[in-house]
Amino acid sequence: MRPSGRAPHELRPIHFTRHYTRYAEGSVLVEFGNTRVICNASVEDRIPRFLKGTGRGWITAEYGMLPRSTHNRMGREAAQGRQGGRTLEIQRFIGRALRAVVDLAALGEVTVTLDCDVIQADGGTRTAAITGSYVALVDAINNRLKKRIITHSPIHGQLASISVGIYEGTPVLDLDYREDSTAETDMNVVMNEAGAFIEIQGTAEGHAFRMNELQAMLDLAKSGINTLLAQQTEVLAKN
């Protein structure tokens, strides 16, 4: 039995609130159960030095957690003078995922930065950040289309992300903190609308997993991501 009482294949309640902040070109509050992340997409007329003269743009991400987004207060990384390894790894993960569904040449010489701020953490913050960032990115691009800055969208696909794992010997979908902290296996999966994998991150914690368990987790991930993709499509269809 999962601590939440959910079935192994059951997602937490998922909600997207678009246009959550006033100034960003795209903004969403994404909620995976009690995990809540604000994703802001900002478009700037600059590109990394290595792209100068190529005509291509860039998609990048920054990720952070509010000090009291967790059970006990964490110190701000800014106060410590540097970002931690986990933070750097997660923001690279988010950026890589989003670049997989964007034509950077069609984007033009701009940088879109996805700022993902975790205001409450209960497991799955990086997967929520990726799933919410896609919605914010679409809104940012639609903003440029509406202003006729660009004539067609550089986004050529859709994506979402979810966690899966093995909890008390059972493959489960969308782990919350209580499950994630004691799971035998924890995995993060990103897939597109065609059912193809963009990234898989998986680690065994004490007990190695077998091929049949891996397949069971990937099947759960595909099912959950299909639900997330449908919810993204539904929320983006609204004004």
From Swiss-Prot:
Q: Where does phosphate bind?
A: R86, G124, T125, R126
Q: Write out the entry's keywords from A to Z.
A: Nucleotidyltransferase, RNA-binding, rRNA processing, Transferase, tRNA processing, tRNA-binding
Pfam families this protein is in?
Answer: RNase_PH, RNase_PH_C
SUPFAM superfamilies the UniProt entry points to? Ribonuclease PH domain 2-like, Ribosomal protein S5 domain 2-like
Q: Which domain of life is it from?
A: Bacteria
- What sections of the protein cross the membrane? none
PANTHER family on file: EXOSOME COMPLEX COMPONENT (PTHR11953), EXOSOME COMPLEX COMPONENT RRP41 (PTHR11953:SF0)
Q: How does it assemble?
A: Homohexameric ring arranged as a trimer of dimers.
Which family is this protein grouped under? Belongs to the RNase PH family.
Protein name, UniProt field: Ribonuclease PH
